[in-house]
C-alpha cells in the first residue's frame, strides 16, 4: 500500500485581537494582529475581466446533475459533485460527474455497486493535479481514482472523521480541515498501514473561541470551512471563521481578515478590512445566515479570490479589488459553485437561477448578454444542467 503523509490542521482562532501567533501550555492561539489594511478602491468588472465564455453542460439523462455542491477543474476537465435525489438499494447516490471543456459528459466517478472498486458515500473529495487523480474521503477510507475514472487504491482513514475540507499539497502530502466535539486539534498524521498520529501541533478547547458581544457569547461552529493551495503557501479558513490563515514551512499566521463585529446587541455587520464588501444583517429578523461566511478562497499568480455570498477579487500587485454582484444590475452574473484554473475564474449558475436572472432583466427592461440570450433561443429551461461561466482575468497591473 502506498504511504503518504497527511497534515491535519484543525484550528479556530480566538476572536480577540491581542497577539498574532502565541504558544502557551501546548496551545497555538491565533488572532488578527498584523493583518494588512488597504484603502477602498473602485473598479468595474471590465477592469479585471478579459473575456467571458459560456459553457453549456450536456443534458442527457446520464449527465444530469440534479443538484451540484462542489466543482473543480484541471486539464480541460470539469469535475462537479452531484448528489441526486434518486435512491438505489436504499442508499442516496452521490457522484462526481466529469465534463470536458466543451461541456460534453465524459463519465461518473462514484457509482453505486457491490464491487470492491465502488462506493456509496462521498464525504469530501479533492484533485491531485500533479498526479491527475481524484481523492475521495467516504468517512472511513480515502479512495483514489484516475481522471478517467480508473480505480487506483483504497486506504483506511477512520481517525480523520469528521473532515470539512481537504486538499493535496505541492509536495504530495495532504491537508484536511477538521475538528472534534470538545476541542480543536492540529496534528501531523502519517498515512501508513497503521495510520499513526505522529505529532500534535495544537490543542484549542472550545471555551477559548469566544467573541465579546456576540449572541450567546460564542460563534456558531458550523459552515463548510475551506482550504486553498498556491505554490508553497496554504490558505485555510476554519468553518464559519472570520480569518484566512496562511500555513507555510510549519508556520501559521493570519493572512486576510473578515470580521463579524457586533455593533449593538443582535445586530451584526460583516466587514472586510480589505474594504472589498460590506453588508448588514439583523439577527432578530433573519437569523444568522451561514452563506455569509467565507465558503471558498483561491490564490493565483495575480489574484486572491474570496467567496461568501459574493465574489471578491483582489489584484495582489495593484492592491485593488472588485465585488462581483449577483443581481441584474451587475455587470456579470456569479454562480453558487466556483473554482479557478490558472488565471480564470469559473462559476456555475444553476438553470433555475439563470431563468430567474432572465425574468429580472425583463422586469427592468434590460437586454440579456448575447451569450445568455443564445442559450434561451436554443430552448434552455429550468430543468437543464447548470451553465458554466469562465471569466478570463487580466494579468496586468493598474
Regions found by a protein language model. Give the residues of each.
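Conserved blade-ending motifs and adjacent loop-strand segments that build the rim/top face
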Residues: 256-273, 280, 287-288, 318-342, ...
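Blade/loop signatures of beta-propeller domains
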Residues: 21-58
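Beta-strand-rich domains and repeat architectures in extracellular enzymes and scaffolds
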Residues: 53-92
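Repeated scaffold domains used in trafficking and secretory/extracellular systems
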Residues: 67-70, 120-125, 160-168, 292-295, ...
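Blade-loop segments of beta-propeller domains
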Residues: 58-63, 67, 95-99, 104-131
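Asp-box/WD-like beta-propeller blade repeats and closely related beta-sheet repeat scaffolds
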Residues: 120-122, 137-185, 200-213
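Short beta-strand elements that form the blades of beta-propeller/WD-repeat-like
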Residues: 76-89, 132-138, 172-181, 228-245, ...
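Short coil/turn segments at the loop-to-beta-strand junctions that recur within blades
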Residues: 61, 110-118, 157-163, 204-209, ...
Amino acid at each position: 500500500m502506498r504511504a503518504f503523509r497527511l497534515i491535519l490542521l484543525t484550528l479556530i482562532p480566538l476572536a480577540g485581537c491581542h497577539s498574532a501567533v502565541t504558544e502557551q501550555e501546548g496551545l497555538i492561539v491565533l488572532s488578527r494582529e498584523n493583518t494588512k489594511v488597504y484603502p477602498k478602491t473602485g473598479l468595474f468588472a471590465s477592469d479585471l475581466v478579459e473575456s467571458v465564455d459560456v459553457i453549456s453542460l450536456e443534458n442527457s439523462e446520464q449527465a444530469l446533475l440534479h443538484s451540484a455542491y462542489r466543482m473543480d477543474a484541471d486539464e480541460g476537465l470539469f469535475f462537479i459533485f452531484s448528489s441526486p435525489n434518486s435512491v438505489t438499494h436504499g442508499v442516496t447516490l452521490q457522484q462526481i460527474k466529469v465534463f470536458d471543456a466543451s461541456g460534453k459528459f465524459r463519465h461518473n466517478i462514484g457509482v453505486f455497486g457491490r464491487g470492491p472498486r465502488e462506493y456509496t458515500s462521498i464525504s469530501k473529495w479533492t484533485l491531485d493535479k500533479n498526479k491527475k487523480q481524484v481523492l475521495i474521503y467516504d468517512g472511513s477510507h480515502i479512495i483514489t481514482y484516475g481522471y478517467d475514472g480508473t480505480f487506483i487504491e483504497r486506504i483506511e482513514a477512520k481517525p480523520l472523521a469528521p473532515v470539512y475540507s481537504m486538499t493535496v499539497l505541492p509536495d504530495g502530502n495532504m491537508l484536511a480541515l477538521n475538528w472534534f466535539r470538545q476541542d480543536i486539534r492540529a496534528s501531523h498524521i502519517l498515512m501508513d498501514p497503521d495510520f499513526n498520529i505522529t505529532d500534535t501541533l495544537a490543542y484549542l478547547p472550545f471555551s477559548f473561541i469566544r467573541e465579546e458581544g456576540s449572541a450567546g457569547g460564542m460563534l456558531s461552529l458550523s459552515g463548510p470551512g475551506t482550504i486553498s493551495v498556491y505554490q508553497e503557501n496554504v490558505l485555510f479558513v476554519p468553518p464559519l471563521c472570520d480569518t484566512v490563515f496562511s500555513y507555510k514551512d510549519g508556520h501559521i499566521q493570519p493572512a486576510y481578515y473578515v470580521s463579524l463585529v457586533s455593533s449593538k446587541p443582535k445586530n451584526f455587520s460583516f466587514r472586510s478590512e480589505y474594504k472589498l464588501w460590506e453588508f448588514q444583517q439583523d439577527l432578530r429578523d433573519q437569523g444568522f445566515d451561514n452563506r455569509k461566511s467565507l465558503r471558498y478562497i483561491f490564490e493565483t499568480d495575480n489574484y486572491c479570490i474570496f467567496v461568501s455570498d459574493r465574489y471578491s477579487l483582489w489584484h495582489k500587485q495593484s492592491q485593488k479589488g472588485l465585488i462581483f454582484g449577483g443581481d441584474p444590475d451587475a455587470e456579470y452574473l456569479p454562480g453558487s459553485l466556483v473554482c479557478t484554473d490558472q488565471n480564470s475564474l469559473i462559476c456555475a449558475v444553476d438553470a433555475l437561477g439563470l431563468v430567474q436572472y432572465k425574468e429580472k432583466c425583463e422586469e427592468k427592461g434590460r437586454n440579456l448578454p448575447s451569450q445568455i440570450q443564445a442559450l434561451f433561443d436554443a430552448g434552455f429551461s429550468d430543468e437543464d444542467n447548470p451553465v458554466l461561466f469562465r471569466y478570463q482575468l487580466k494579468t496586468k497591473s493598474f
